Design a protein with these regions (language model features):
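N-terminal low-complexity, acidic/polar interaction/targeting segments
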Residues: 1-206
């Protein structure tokens, strides 16, 4: 049986200039008919979130589950999404409900290379240092303590607003867990350097 006969097909929810990494929980405002059509066509409450930068779709998306449908404070529709895991995108079709694509779901290995553990420890330390500089150390420590898998730990970089969208896209597209941790760690180190510089500037002018 060919991949096209077995691969699940999910509606695409385009993310313009945004990236949602696996493990993230987000509330998504539904702002146009394209988004509404994708959500309404969800298969068993599942869709695939695909970054769209400068009009081009990324080759990797994130399978997500719709866990809530609500009205936002401004009266518009919103949905609560739980991002589950990566997916390579296959052939697509444009139909009445919008864009539907075959997905090859990518699950992180349960036993990544030993190097991943060392990178994960360093990643935790850098993120914790940033959080403590911002007076948010306890909450972030509790959050990180609940994440055991190195690949999922790297994906927490998606929550950092200072990390550029293009960098988050590279993290999304990095399937290998060790390489992904390196990419996420480099991004967090740059974030730490920026936060440290801003802190020194504030201290100098105070």
């Amino acid at each position: 049986m060919s991949q096209s006969e077995t691969a699940p097909r999910l509606p695409v929810l385009p993310l313009d200039d945004a990236v949602v990494l696996p493990g993230m929980s987000v509330t998504f405002p539904v702002s146009d008919d394209e988004q509404a059509a994708a959500l309404d066509a969800a298969v068993e409450n599942r869709i695939v979130l695909v970054p769209r930068l400068e009009g081009a779709f990324a080759p990797i998306g994130t399978v997500a589950e719709i866990v809530g449908d609500m009205a936002l404070p401004d009266g518009t529709r919103g949905v609560a999404l739980e991002a589950v895991h990566r997916a390579r995108l296959g052939p697509a079709e444009v139909g009445a409900p919008g864009l539907v694509v075959e997905v090859d779901e990518v699950i992180d290995p349960s036993d990544p290379a030993p190097e991943a553990d060392e990178l994960a420890r360093e990643y935790r330390a850098v993120v914790q240092e940033v959080a403590e500089m911002r007076g948010d150390g306890v909450r972030v420590a509790q959050f990180l303590a609940g994440i055991e898998r190195p690949g999922r730990l790297a994906d927490t970089a998606g929550y950092a607003p200072e990390i550029p969208v293009g960098r988050k896209l590279r993290i999304l597209e990095t399937i290998d867990v060790v390489d992904r941790l390196r990419e996420a760690l480099d991004a967090q180190r740059e974030r730490l350097a920026d936060v440290s510089l801003r802190r020194r500037i504030r201290q100098d002018v105070s």
